[in-house]
């Protein structure tokens, strides 16, 4: 016999269903190729060239990509959940490629803490983060760094995923503390500090 409050049944889309429908709607949006950007398709291999560089990506076999009059359309064969998800994802990735080769992506990090700082060392970063030795962070292929001041790092590149992952990897070298806020954080990140324990 069931004891306690009975679970409430609700009508409507399941969480997964809502996500699939969202990705499907994204996939249906055509992509306009801006002037100065060239897109070519060889089988399922998509190449995007622009002022900032070139990116290539293999398109999933279930997804079709066509181009006419500087407009790219992404289509799926049916409404299966996998294909609806791939539909939106593929459209997003292609759009990111076009934006990257045209304008480049950036992610800014800030360093907080007495004595904490960063300096360029060739193409790499030399980080002083309170350890007994400096931390050298090597730039992955396709990534460059700007250091406008000793407490700011700007990660730059045409691959949005790589820019984001590189910034995340730098942050792990000294994540911000919750008590003093010392460490490396994203420029837009808000650190919710905890109050330290006080003696009685």
What is each stretch, according to the model?
Residues 19-168, 172-200:
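N-terminal intrinsically disordered, cationic/polar leader segments
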């Amino acid at each position: 016999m069931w004891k306690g409050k009975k679970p409430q049944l609700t009508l409507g889309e399941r969480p997964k269903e809502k996500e699939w429908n969202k990705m499907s709607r994204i996939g249906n949006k055509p992509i306009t190729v801006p002037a100065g950007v060239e897109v070519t398709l060889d089988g399922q291999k998509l190449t995007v060239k622009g002022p900032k560089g070139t990116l290539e990506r293999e398109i999933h076999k279930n997804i079709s990509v066509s181009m006419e009059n500087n407009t790219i359309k992404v289509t799926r064969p049916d409404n299966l959940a996998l294909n609806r998800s791939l539909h939106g994802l593929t459209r997003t990735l292609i759009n990111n490629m076009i934006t990257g080769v045209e304008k480049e992506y950036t992610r800014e990090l800030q360093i907080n803490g007495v004595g904490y700082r960063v300096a360029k060392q060739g193409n790499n970063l030399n980080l002083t983060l309170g350890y007994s030795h400096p931390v050298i962070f090597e730039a992955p292929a396709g990534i460059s760094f700007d250091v406008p001041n000793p407490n700011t790092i700007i990660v730059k590149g045409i691959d949005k995923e790589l820019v984001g992952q590189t910034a995340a990897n730098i942050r792990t070298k000294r994540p911000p503390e919750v008590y003093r806020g010392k460490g490396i954080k994203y420029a837009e990140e808000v650190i919710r500090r905890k109050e330290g324990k006080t003696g009685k």
